């Protein structure tokens, strides 16, 4: 909280007066950044391009967002390691709903756009949450280690997803995936 107040150019008491505690600050940042990220991901999915290009653009949008603001990403997704002042703050309790929200949003897009056959609603949720989990885990690993370029990671993740996404037909009357 000291670093956040200093970066904002205010005192810590003013920060606490506005947000109450770290949980209040977390909730405000989480909403703001998740809303912006989801808007960007929707734009990538809706771009006038071939399906494979949109898949890659969506993956790249997520990775670009966490790369552009790594401190915000770490604050939202990871506890401050070894910081005694943060012992009562459970980031996992707060970050799980963010990932769940992203998974449900992606599941809705998949359900609306792809013909997955019988059980499509459940399968869309499996895919939505699975893809979000993959993006989160791979992005977290990549941001911490930088073992390859962002473009290489995007291609690798898209290759992993592509088999079944390429085979699924668009839903009749839907906007297409």
Region spans (language model):
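Hydrophobic alpha-helical connector segments
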Residues: 28, 43-71, 154
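Generic hydrophobic, amphipathic alpha-helix propensity
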Residues: 4, 29-33, 37, 41, ...
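Secondary-structure edge/capping motif, primarily at the C-terminal ends of alpha-helices
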Residues: 41-48, 76-84, 138-146
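Helix-turn-helix
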Residues: 1-24, 28
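Amphipathic alpha-helical packing segments from all-alpha helical-bundle domains
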Residues: 86-115, 122-133, 137, 152-163
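Long amphipathic alpha-helical segments
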Residues: 144-148, 168-177
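Short, hydrophobic secondary-structure boundary micro-motifs
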Residues: 74-77, 85, 119, 151, ...
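Alpha-helical DNA-contacting segments of helix-turn-helix folds
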Residues: 19, 26-33, 76, 95-98
């Amino acid at each position: 909280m000291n670093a956040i107040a200093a970066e904002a150019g205010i005192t810590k008491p003013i920060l606490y007066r506005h947000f109450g505690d770290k949980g209040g600050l977390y909730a405000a940042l989480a909403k703001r950044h998740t809303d912006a990220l989801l808007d960007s991901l929707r734009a990538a999915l809706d771009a006038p391009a071939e399906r494979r290009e949109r898949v890659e653009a969506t993956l790249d949008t997520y990775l670009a967002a966490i790369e552009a603001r790594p401190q915000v990403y770490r604050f939202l997704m990871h506890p401050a390691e070894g910081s005694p002042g943060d012992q009562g703050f459970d980031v996992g309790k707060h970050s799980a709903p963010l990932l769940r929200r992203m998974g449900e949003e992606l599941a809705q897009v998949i359900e609306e756009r792809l013909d997955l056959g019988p059980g499509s609603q459940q399968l869309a949720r499996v895919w939505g949450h699975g893809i979000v989990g993959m993006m989160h885990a791979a992005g977290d690993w990549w941001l911490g280690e930088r073992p390859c370029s962002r473009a290489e990671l995007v291609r690798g993740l898209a290759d992993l997803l592509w088999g079944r996404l390429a085979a699924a037909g668009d839903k009749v009357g839907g906007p297409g995936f």
